[in-house]
Amino acid sequence: MKAVGIDLGSREVKLVVMQEDRIVKRFKIGTMSFYRDYCTFQDKITVDMDKLGIKGAEAAISTGYGRNNTDLNIFTPINEVKAHVYGAICQSGLKDFILLDVGGQDVKVARVQNSILTDLELNDKCAASCGRYLENMASVLEMPLNKMTEYTKNPVELNSTCAVFSESELIGKIAEGASVESLCAGVNYSLYKRLQPLLTKFKGRRLVLAGGVAKGIALREFLKNDYDDIICLEDPQFNGAIGCCYLGRKRLLQEVDCDKMNYQKFISSLLKIY
């Protein structure tokens, strides 16, 4: 059984192919390049699967930012939250956890109990608690993003609640002579502080991190103050696409089970006749 999952982000499109219960292919393409080079536009957007090197998919599920953008021909669209919850279940093997997904321009916090989503908080209105904020700050500091997100010690205080004003505040701290290390730590701690209000109602022992920001060492260190067990998924950026594959495979298995049941009923009815 082969399933393909696609997560259409604002900056990148992530694709995953799952054969049986193994991921056999994963890759990402810039969003503009994806629509320009791999799609045609008629009544619906049609993805050129051959051009992507994907053949023989029996299930195709899509998710992403914006409902209309994910309505692709031959793909069944699902909402982002469901995709990321399924992805976290698939990657972690857990049934009970709090999921924190920090994407490029939104944040999702979900409570999962016995593999079922039971509570949810979203922030899709402000970039100050998202990955785009970290990218902008790294650009101001002229430092690679993965390097900036390592620092935790002696953070400078950054109080602005707006991503735009935060840049000006950071430049002011640079002018005051703050060290690069403390500036980086300040950026990381300010992200943590902005996430705290969303996390307040989600008390629990185990936190699963997804999204590109999950790779940052500093955020994981700060979150250890609030949770006993911090789990960073192996493929945090591909989590949504993996969740799509997981759901696609689950539906295929249900169809097979249904076919088997119908076949058994058919055989039983024949035996009764004869």
Residue ranges and their predicted role:
Residues 3-7, 59-61, 95-101, 208:
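Short glycine-aspartate micro-motif
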Residues 86, 131-135, 139, 233-273:
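Glycine-rich phosphate-binding/hydrolytic loop that grips phosphoryl groups
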Residues 114-154, 159-162, 246-250:
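Glycine-rich phosphate-binding loop plus the immediately following alpha-helix
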Residues 163-203, 237:
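Adenine-nucleotide phosphate-binding core of ATP-dependent small-molecule kinases
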Residues 76-81, 224-243:
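Conserved phosphate-binding/catalytic loops in two-lobed NTP-binding clefts
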Residues 31-34, 50-82, 92, 118-120, ...:
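Short beta-strand-loop/turn "lid" adjacent to the catalytic site in phosphate-handling enzymes
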Residues 3-40, 117-126:
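Short glycine-rich, Thr/Ser-proximal phosphate-binding strand/loop in the N-terminal lobe
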Residues 65-66, 199, 203-226, 237-240:
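Glycine-rich phosphate-binding loops at beta-strand->alpha-helix junctions
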